Amino acid sequence: MTKLLVLGGRFAGLTAAYTAKRLLGDKVDVTLINNTPYAAFRPGMPHVSIGVFKAEDLEVDLATALPAKGIKFVLGTVNAIDAKKNKVEYSAPDGKKENITYDYLVVAFGAKLGVEHLNGWDDYGSSVCEPDFATALHEKLEKFEGGNIAIGSGVFYQGTLKPRGKYPENWASVADSACEGPIFEMSLMIPAYLKKRGIMDKTHITIFSPGEEILTDIAKESRGVVKSLFAQAGFDTVWNFKLKELKKGEIVSEDGKTIKADIAIVLPPYEANDAVKNSTPDLFDDGGFVVTDEHMRSVKYPNVYSCGDSNQITVPKLGFLAVMTSRIAMQDLANRLGVPTKVDTYTPEVVCIADNPLEGFAIAVNDTTFYGGDEKIAQPSATNHIKKELFTKYFMWTNGDMALDKYLASW
């Protein structure tokens, strides 16, 4: 039986594992390695930070969910990929190093949150990118009685996309931030939360970005609407702010600019996974992301696929693109293993919903201008809030097996 090894249990890894088993059945032995025993629904972590959910409400138990679909689960942290010997080294929970071989590999362990680039992070940093971060931020917000809050993104250590994969030039560009959707979402949620607690009038909010302005991956017109919303809310905005240090009461940029911040809510810097430095070098580009073709196959090692944030092709780093790339990769694999399957065309699009659950509305974004297209929708409505709620329930109900996602992309 063909051995498929999947590295990572987030959107990309789960979609790859479930799709491969669905398409190939007994033709493939699927094993998934993840560094936590659960898969967190990360689009719900901002909701955890304001007390709408607890983190454990949004976690899928992989040791139960995966075997139920005929997929083996291994708890471990990937240390290295040897693409020449078809072998992966990982560390088990007891620290022991193990090796596992494969016929085909899916690299879906995502990017790394490079908090070590930010001096003072452990003492003063807050985020919503991981369950423990979101829980800690909620505890901090519950104690907050007014002052200054800064919300923004760290630098994306992406490299220069060289060598570039075999796909159209406009599918991937160098970006200042890996994804500023959570920043926009928090800019909606935090004021609503502070109003609910009766302390919004005691609080000043600043939005910052490492780019020339926020959300440069969507249309200029949509960014203009967002900036108008910020102005109406009385927020300060600071662009070209490349965060370097967090201190008590303020944050500092690489060029010495400061922003007052009793609480700093940050999308940390993104960079390549730690395993990259120990792995076969020519699997990756100069930023540590896997170089592939449009079917997500490595251009150097055709039995290696890369999906989601670990792939050079996915810019910005979005769950929507993670699911799409994984589905395409496993459709391609099915054909290679003798099961005729239609392979979807990769059509990159910025798709997300910035939710405001405390006020019952959300802004849905569908935008292709980053890739040279002309779609530029940014629509606020109560219906979009309901869509976000349904998407959350859908993910949890299916244990992350989003087979219908491509038909529900407007969510």
Residue spans of the language-model regions?
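FAD-binding core/adjacent interface of flavoenzyme oxidoreductases
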Residues: 72-192, 196, 265
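C-terminal auxiliary extensions adjacent to catalytic cores
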Residues: 363-411
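Glycine-rich, N-terminal phosphate-binding loop of Rossmann-like dinucleotide-binding domains
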Residues: 9, 92, 109-110, 153, ...
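Beta1-alpha1 glycine-rich phosphate/pyrophosphate-binding loop at the start
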Residues: 2-75, 164-217
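A Rossmann-like FAD-binding core segment of flavoenzymes
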Residues: 28-31, 68-88, 100, 191-287, ...
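FAD-binding beta-loop-beta segment adjacent to the flavin cofactor pocket
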Residues: 288-305, 356-376
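A conserved FAD-binding loop/helix module that cradles the flavin
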Residues: 310-356
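FAD-site-proximal beta/loop scaffold in flavoenzymes
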Residues: 122-148, 155, 258-263, 267-324
